[in-house]
Amino acid sequence: VRPEQRVNVAGVQTPSLYLGDEALNNNFDDVDEFKQMSGGVATVFVRSGEDFIRISTSLTKQDGNRAIGTVLDRQGPAYQRLLAGQSYIGRAVLFERSYMTQYSPVRDASGKVIAVLFIGFDYTDAQNAQFANLKRFRIGQTGSLALLDEQKHWLVPPAGVQALEQAVPVILELAQKPGQG
């Protein structure tokens, strides 16, 4: 990292990050090759203060443009682990898409985290297809499966329920019909 040597990445001034003599800011060769070879996405983040900024990525935003110049979400599952110098492997929602991810910290000679390497595989479409199948699944005439995520949003709502607060009356009604729910 060369913090004194700033590079403009999508309108954001970032510290320059090098691999040997090669600047990684705005260099998309390796991340695009990873995408072509694996079908996944890759990102190089550089640390700037307490933020990690995407300086090279094959990840795209909703508008189809590269997500360069954007920062790692401080509220996301990886952020605190990376600050502590630990990797994160798990789910992340990025630009409204679900990914299975790995974030790995990069340290300088003193052990300070100066950058992050990321790879991710988008499973949004496969997950949506599976949820659609589960929504159609019935147990008996009126029974159904239900899946609630950690933010209490329905991934697969019970039959007849769209909002969490609707679930209790529907479940109570079904419970009053033994053998029919």
How should these model regions be labeled?
Residues R2-A84, A92-L94, Q151-L174:
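Extracellular/periplasmic ligand-sensing ectodomains of membrane signal-transduction proteins
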